[in-house]
Amino acid sequence: VVELYEERDTSRPAFLYNLTYQNHGGYEQAAFNGGNWEVDPEHRVRVTEGFDEVRGQAEEYLSCLTYTDDAFAGLIDYFSQQKDPVIICMVGDHIPHFTGDVESEYSGLEYQMRSRGTPFVIWANYPLEEENVGYIGMSQLAPLLLQTAEIPLSPFYQSLAELSQDVPVLTRDFYRLSTGDFAIYLFTEMPEENPLLRRYLYFENYLVHCRGADMYGLSVPYAGTTESGDFSA
């Protein structure tokens, strides 16, 4: 990220979408190395209680998180020293799948919310108003980021921003209203009671099926939600 930033065209603004599999499963390195896997002692996390059946996976996942913490801290430290205004948004899309083997308290819709609920942070190297936006859907994160950067929204993102006032969370299986109520729906069914949601689904259908597959990633709501949002300057 730093290398791409330093090689950018400084005559114009730059945008970088960086996807990493750093902490993605499976978490089974020890199973292929006789119970051992290489990790620096300062990053090694050991689970001493619980997680009996998946303890190795839990330890690997948590140890990987310590690497991510250090890397993100280094990234923030670097950009905090840059003169150009910079905004960074960091988010994950779901928690580890092995938690389903040990978590039996939740099921159905509530389990989906908890397993797909992840925190996110929007940080800038200049002052931002601190705010916790609560639950929002992954598809709502892009317009929120653009608004934070004071970048004009396209008609599509304007539609998403308007929809988020009433339907802050929208996934492939359900949506959550601003009242906190949930509704389960199928993509084959058109919600008659919410005109903004109907407009969004029409918009989505146009972008996906009429504009071509290259628009797919821009428009389809992903089954991920943020459990908590945090603005920090």
Regions of interest found by a model, annotated:
Residues 1-233:
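Solvent-exposed soluble domains appended to multi-pass membrane proteins
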